[in-house]
């Protein structure tokens, strides 16, 4: 065989091997936390479809996390299952604008100011998810609370909220930060570990108010539309089982699954437990 022919054959074999490896990685990129086995994405989806709510944790400025979220959303939609997307990124008071966007009644030029009024990340990071929801008429749910409330709690504590501010929160909401929750927040938000005790307590209270309010919003939505699965996109600190999922479990019978990303020094294959999440996306 001529030298050129041998080189061509080797090149083709290398391409085939590369494609095979890429395919294998794409199908086996999920860690099932319960037994620490790496499983196929479709196997994970089979379990996620059993839940009322699927929480997907993200680091907001990691593009690969948003690709993972869209992959799960697309898999749900293509299965024909009724779906909605819950968003930490939007406040409840922007629900009318979210509905208008999904229904195609508002243009991108009209929606972008709404997006940036709610969220600080560049539009391209969430563009594909929001365009997919619009194209396929997947309802979007604004979960968050007004910025002024969370900022007040973070700076001055839950007790500093006035009556008007508390009226904007779910009825009967309280803020009981126990030692276990404080340690959870320290783990999830390494940047805040060195803050003074009182300031860190206020930060924990703000996180809990967020978690409880977003859980309440999810519960109210599912009570009105119980046949729909909600995929929730939120920061890892809210999406972990001790965050919003824990509040949903305490306040309702709705079931949930938690998918979190692999994050160096925070979420590791060896260190992650069933108290953190159900699945870890390895890519």
Q: How would you describe each model-predicted region?
A:
Residues 2-13:
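N-terminal Sec-pathway targeting helices
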Residues 49-57, 109-114:
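Acidic/histidine-rich, surface-exposed loop or edge segments in extracytoplasmic proteins
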Residues 62-66, 76, 82-84, 92-102:
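Membrane-embedded segments
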Residues 59-63, 90-94, 146-150, 236-239, ...:
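Solvent-exposed loop/turn segments at secondary-structure junctions
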Residues 84-90, 258-262:
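Short internal beta-strands
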Residues 96-221:
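A substrate-binding/cap region within the structured catalytic cores of diverse enzymes
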Residues 18-51:
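N- or domain-start disorder-to-order transition segments that initiate the globular core
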Residues 213-216, 221-222, 228-231, 236-283:
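C-terminal regions of proteins
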């Amino acid at each position: 065989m001529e030298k050129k022919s041998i080189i061509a054959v080797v090149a083709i074999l290398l391409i085939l091997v590369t494609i095979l490896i890429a395919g294998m990685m794409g199908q086996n990129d999920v860690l099932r936390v319960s037994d620490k086995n790496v499983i196929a994405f479709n196997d994970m989806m089979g379990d996620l479809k059993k839940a009322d709510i699927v929480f997907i944790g993200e680091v907001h400025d990691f593009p690969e996390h948003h690709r993972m979220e869209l992959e799960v959303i697309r898999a749900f939609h293509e299965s024909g299952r009724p779906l909605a997307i819950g968003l930490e990124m939007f406040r409840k008071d922007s629900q009318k604008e979210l509905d208008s966007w999904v229904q195609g009644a508002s243009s991108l030029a009209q929606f972008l100011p709404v997006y940036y009024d709610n969220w600080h990340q560049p539009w391209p990071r969430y563009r594909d998810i929001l365009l997919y929801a619009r194209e396929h008429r997947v309802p979007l749910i604004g979960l968050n609370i007004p910025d002024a409330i969370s900022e007040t709690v973070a700076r001055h504590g839950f007790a500093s909220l006035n009556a008007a501010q508390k009226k904007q929160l779910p009825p009967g909401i309280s803020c009981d930060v126990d030692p276990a929750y404080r340690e959870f927040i320290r783990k999830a938000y390494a940047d805040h570990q060195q803050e003074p005790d009182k300031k860190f307590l206020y930060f924990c209270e703000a996180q809990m108010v967020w978690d409880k309010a977003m859980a309440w919003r999810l519960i109210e939505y599912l009570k009105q539309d119980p046949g729909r699965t909600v995929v929730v996109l939120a920061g890892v600190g809210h999406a972990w089982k001790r965050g919003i999922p824990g509040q949903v479990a305490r306040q309702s019978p709705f079931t949930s699954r938690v998918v979190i990303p692999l994050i160096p020094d925070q979420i590791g294959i060896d260190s992650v437990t069933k108290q953190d999440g159900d699945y870890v996306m390895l890519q």
